[in-house]
Amino acid sequence: MVSALKCSLAVAVMISLACSAYAIKCYQCESLTMPKCGLKFEADETLLLDCSRIGPPRYLQNFFPLRNATGCMKKTLESVAGHPQIVRSCYFGDINNIQAGCQSDPSMPFVKQLGCDVCTKDECNGSSSLAPIAGAILLFFGVARLLA
């Protein structure tokens, strides 16, 4: 009975850590409505979004239905007026082939996309993406050692 309880506890710890390890947080903003989101970015906690809580944009849902975000992105767009606009958001798609995930929104035909940068770290500027996984593995072995 005790070993079954220990095993259940270890599995529960691993599941909760695995879920948190794959959730990525990205900044979500547009420089058109929020100047601090522009080229001179001013980090702000209120702009952070847990990407596991949202799905891909409508125009990408045919390509990535019910898929979790795989990274963060920063798109540089040129509006009709010719001014550069920065859009920061969660990225949905293959990190190794960003062409599909970075495609332009077809509902905005007059906006030209100048660039799309993709990264796989929280907030695109901080902790290594392997750090949460490595921590989860170490914690699992620590719990297993205690329960043994």
UniProtKB/Swiss-Prot annotation:
Disulfide bonds join 26-72, 29-37, 51-90, 102-116, 119-124. Its main location: membrane. It is a lipid-anchor; GPI-anchor. Keywords: Cell membrane, Cell projection, Disulfide bond, Glycoprotein, GPI-anchor, Lipoprotein, Membrane, Signal, Transmembrane, Transmembrane helix. GO terms for biological process: negative regulation of sensory perception of pain; regulation of synaptic transmission, cholinergic; sleep. Glycans are attached at residues 68, 125. One of its GO terms (cellular component) is neuron projection membrane. It comes from the Eukaryota. Residues 126-148 form a propeptide. Necessary for the maintenance of persistent fluctuating activities and suppression of acute evoked activities in abdominal leucokinin-producing (ABLK) neurons to negatively regulate neuron excitability involved in nociceptive (perception of pain) behavioral responses. Belongs to the quiver family. This is UPAR/Ly6 domain-containing protein bero.
